[in-house]
Design a protein with these regions (language model features):
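Catalytic cores of the polymerase beta-like nucleotidyltransferase superfamily
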Residues: 1-176
Length: 176
């Protein structure tokens, strides 16, 4: 992925649950890759570089692509901004930066990203102190909870699920 992202001159990161699980020493087989550019094209070029040339499944409605490599499912997406209408769960999507993409994440612990380019490989991008929340076992939204939950009310259920699965507390402000 690093080689292809560098060839394409795309800033690329692994983000979300896979990064969280690295720091929690938990196994994870789902990898989310976000790139500042075309995630579908990146997935197709990565597949072309792999020995077994895995099939790339493209989900145009979501602007994502997924491939299976060994026992991993790797999903690729372009960094984006999302906004929601109050009467719909379907977001309006625009291209964005890594910071925009992190802003749209459900919780600080899922907004963690690691650089995948040669110049930033393994460098943590953590604008919301998600590492501190991991250490303190706290579930917190990266933005105001009213914004995060009104964008997608199912995130409330995800907070409860993560709290139960990980043994974390939901932050007071997030609960309100």
């Amino acid at each position: 992925i690093t080689e292809v992202a560098d060839e394409m001159k795309l800033d690329t990161y692994v983000i979300g649950g896979f990064v969280r699980d690295i720091f929690l020493h938990r196994p994870s087989k789902d990898i989310d890759i976000v790139t500042v550019g075309n995630g579908i094209e990146l997935a197709q070029k990565v597949s072309g570089k792999l020995k077994n040339k895995p099939q790339v499944h493209v989900f145009k409605n979501f602007g994502t692509a997924m491939l299976k490599y060994k026992d991993l499912e790797i999903e690729f997406v372009g960094a984006r901004k999302e906004s929601y209408q109050s009467d719909s769960r379907k977001p309006t999507v625009e291209s964005g930066t890594i910071e925009d993409d992190q802003n749209r994440r459900d919780f600080t612990i899922n907004a963690l990203a690691l650089g995948l380019n040669a110049h930033n490989f393994g460098i943590l991008v953590d604008p919301f102190n998600g590492i501190k929340d991991l250490e303190n076992k706290i579930i917190r939204t990266p933005l105001d909870p009213d914004i995060t939950f009104s964008d997608d009310p199912l995130r409330i259920m995800r907070a409860i699920r993560f709290s139960t699965q990980l043994g974390f507390e939901i932050h007071d402000q997030t609960l309100r």
